[in-house]
Amino acid sequence: MKKQGVLHRDLAALIASLGHRDAIVVADSGLPVPPGVNCIDLAVTKGIPPLLPVLQVILYEMVVERVVIADELQVNQSLVKSIADEVTPVSLEVVSHEQLKSLSQRARAVIRTGEWTPYANVILYSGVAF
């Protein structure tokens, strides 16, 4: 039994299976999951779990080379700053929400949280550890 890091079986398996430049989306509770894209649904109720702690645990185990958020999220500078702080030294790439939804069609999975903040979605692209 694992004692730290990602304990959710499906999420741990997803992270372990990622190859270079594979994408996953850590999403709020409202992002539509594209047909054919796996959804790992962590949402329990409104706000639980929030996006940021889920992102932190994923980043503990995942090498990330690119991060994308929606321009519309920038109205919530507190959350944007928290996300930017977590993914440093990688910078945030900002696209429209429509572009983010389009990019999510090529993701390996959408990890749905209980986050109740509009546009609180983050696409993580896998890097390499060497």
Swiss-Prot record:
Enzyme active site: H20
Recorded name of the encoding gene: rbsD
What InterPro entries does UniProt report for this protein, alphabetically?
D-ribose_pyranase, RbsD-like_sf, RbsD_FucU
Identify the metabolic or biological route this protein is part of: Carbohydrate metabolism; D-ribose degradation; D-ribose 5-phosphate from beta-D-ribopyranose: step 1/2
Catalytic activities: beta-D-ribopyranose = beta-D-ribofuranose
Q: Which named protein is this?
A: D-ribose pyranase
Q: Which family does it belong to?
A: Belongs to the RbsD / FucU family. RbsD subfamily.
Oligomer status and interactors: Homodecamer.
What are the subcellular locations of this protein? Cytoplasm
